[in-house]
Amino acid sequence: MKTLIKNGSIVTKEGTVKTQDVLLHDGVISAIGLNLEETDAHVIEANGKLVTPGLVDLHVHLREPGGEAKETIETGTKAAAKGGFTTVAAMPNTRPVPDSAEQMSWLTGRIDETGVVRVLPYAAITTRQLGRELTDFAKLKEAGAFAFTDDGVGVQSAAMMLEAMKEAAKLEMAIVAHCEENTLIQNGSVHEGVFSKKHGIAGIPSVCESVHIARDVLLAEAAGVHYHVCHISTKESVRVVRDAKRAGIRVTAEVTPHHLLLCDEDIPGLDAHYKMNPPLRGKEDREALIEGLLDGTIDFIATDHAPHTEEEKGQGMERAPFGIVGLETAFPLLYTHFVKKGTFTLKQLVDWLTIDPAETFQLPYGRLEEGAPADVTIIDLEAERAIDPAHFASKGRNTPFAGWTCQGWPVATLVGGKLVWEEKEVAR
């Protein structure tokens, strides 16, 4: 099947915007140019709309198996499609954990059955994510693992992490790390700062994250592995990663939209929709994250989409689980609050959500060029509306951004040339 996207606005490598047609055929982008005509193609009229590579999110929680009340592979990937994401990477903190070839094979089969977009499954570093014994990396890679992580918890043993890094390096695979030193968590629910002091709640100090990253970058240097830091959140962590990159260590990092947009001073009362891990940090941390993204210390943006039920989030700040959803709101939030205000350019935002995560992990996605996979997102930069969780495709409604008015909403998403989501009025 052929699909012809007509008159869309494309961001060039130079950062300018120009009108182009894009022809998709047999799963790839077959032509980009002006006045393309194909008599047997399905036509999507994109006049006045932005056409980008399909967005790539390398940090999501799809909850299946074991957490289907929160999300499933089907609902999570529908949320991804609605948010413009054509590729997502699924974290392994499910029950059971994908820590064996058998479980990974089941997971990839389930993805093939019910996934709406491309899903790259992470495998666990340690059995059941308990930090006691390594999984069989070679067998997991053969079964379809994308990379290795114990996300949700940090690998506490330096010896265990070094062994994991050496095994991953042999396979030319990445170690992806949730960075927390357990002895410093202090049973905290929020950042140790303004909010925790005001409300008398135990806080998680910044050093809990940064000391773990500092340890790991030195281990990564010794092992010669690609080491990736999940959801970086503190100014000290940014400094550690910046110094490591300058030293030539193969370290990369991601940041979430919520850590770019909010700090602990923005939390209104004890609302658990503002509870995530890592927590919202201080104002200086938020500023350092923006600076780190702009100077290349931080490589790309990832949502850390983490759905929970309303009942769980209704338990209050101290008892509710950590996490918020993000797939359906990431682009409009970032476009409205950073591109429209001049902090980021449109090209920077698109790159951080497409080519940069893809290139960081040597993926073929995130490109709008002839011969690339036909993964395309169409966005109406003028469309403006308030975020309404009731309309989410995700099962999760747990967002701190409900009611925020944003511009820049995806209107069509194509994966491998197939239209997987659209607002009906965009197609003809």
From Swiss-Prot:
Pathway: Pyrimidine metabolism; UMP biosynthesis via de novo pathway; (S)-dihydroorotate from bicarbonate: step 3/3
Note describing how the cofactor binds: Binds 2 Zn(2+) ions per subunit.
Database matches in SUPFAM superfamilies: Composite domain of metallo-dependent hydrolases, Metallo-dependent hydrolases
Active site: 304
Catalysed reaction, written as an equation: (S)-dihydroorotate + H2O = N-carbamoyl-L-aspartate + H(+)
Record: residues binding Zn(2+) 2: 151, 178, 231
EC numbers for this chain: 3.5.2.3
InterPro entries per UniProt: Amidohydro-rel, DHOase, DHOase/Allantoinase_Hydrolase, Dihydroorotase_CS, Metal-dep_hydrolase_composite, Metal_Hydrolase
Family: Belongs to the metallo-dependent hydrolases superfamily. DHOase family. Class I DHOase subfamily.
Entry protein name: Dihydroorotase
Organism name: Halalkalibacterium halodurans (strain ATCC BAA-125 / DSM 18197 / FERM 7344 / JCM 9153 / C-125)
Gene: pyrC
